[in-house]
Amino acid sequence: MTVKANKIYDKFKKSNSSLFWCKEKKYEDLWGSINDLLAVRESLKPLFVTVTSSKKKLKALKDFCQREGLILDFKKYDASLDEKWNQFLDREKHNDNYNIFISKKKELINKAKKMVRRGFTLNEGYNSKEFGLLLGYPSCCVENYDKVNILKSLKPYTCNKILFYTNILLTGTGSNCRLASHSLCSFNCKKTIELNKKILKVFKKEIPDYYCFLIKYLKKPLLFWINGKQGNFGLSDTLTVFVFDGELKNNVLNYKKVHLHFPINTAVKLINSPSVKEIESMVKGDRLVIEKKNIKVYKDKKLLIKVKRGKQSAILVDPS
């Protein structure tokens, strides 16, 4: 089913309204960047590069770096985004856009600035191996960036088990719910697991409430639908993910609530999306019965709907 992401997102965005966000005031404007910022501060990564069109976000990053003794540099660029993107980014049509570079070493920032392509936007990524290594990504992930598509390792019609340390599926409108910020070579990548364990230790000390939220949320069972290209960059624009507050036993998932994650660009078309009726039924329901070709959604003992599974639809993952 093809639908506009913004139509579904507007209808169901309240489903995620209670999702935890950092209560620490110094982090409240750093949505989606905390893991990378703390990784650079703790020398777990040498460099963090991001992009924003928000002067508020730029100021928050400057304040953080000044407070924590990090170097920040930025470079303006001209991005010709359409009106839907402008509305999504909540900015004026001709507002400034910034590539932002954060590190402890000025020479790394200078090197990264030379490598950045003009016109980098949320739709594009850097595919240079040299750039990936400069950012401190694991060498195995960098080497396999354009060779391995980790989504293909998650099989349809079954239950996929992964470690919560490598759960990078909760991107898009919930991209604060993650540890790794790079494309993985596999869900069992030892170097990524080691890095993310260290990042979690920093969270536990620095932001204990957020730490407790993450280790619980990243372990929740989920269903996802793949939309469009399955590239390793920008999973946030290819996945629709439903996270269940519940427990999966054998083929039955009993749950109390559903959290919905949509592509970060809500103007995109979802070419492979559950219908509004299917979403409404899962939000209303409290139990899923997982069959090979279908998922039955129940409320109490009443069958609400059957959701078809496919090669790219309703793929079940149970992190632990």
Model-based region annotation:
Residues 2-119, 137-143, 147-320:
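A conserved ligand/cofactor-binding region detector
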Residues 128:
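Generic structural marker for isolated residues within well-ordered, non-membrane alpha-helices
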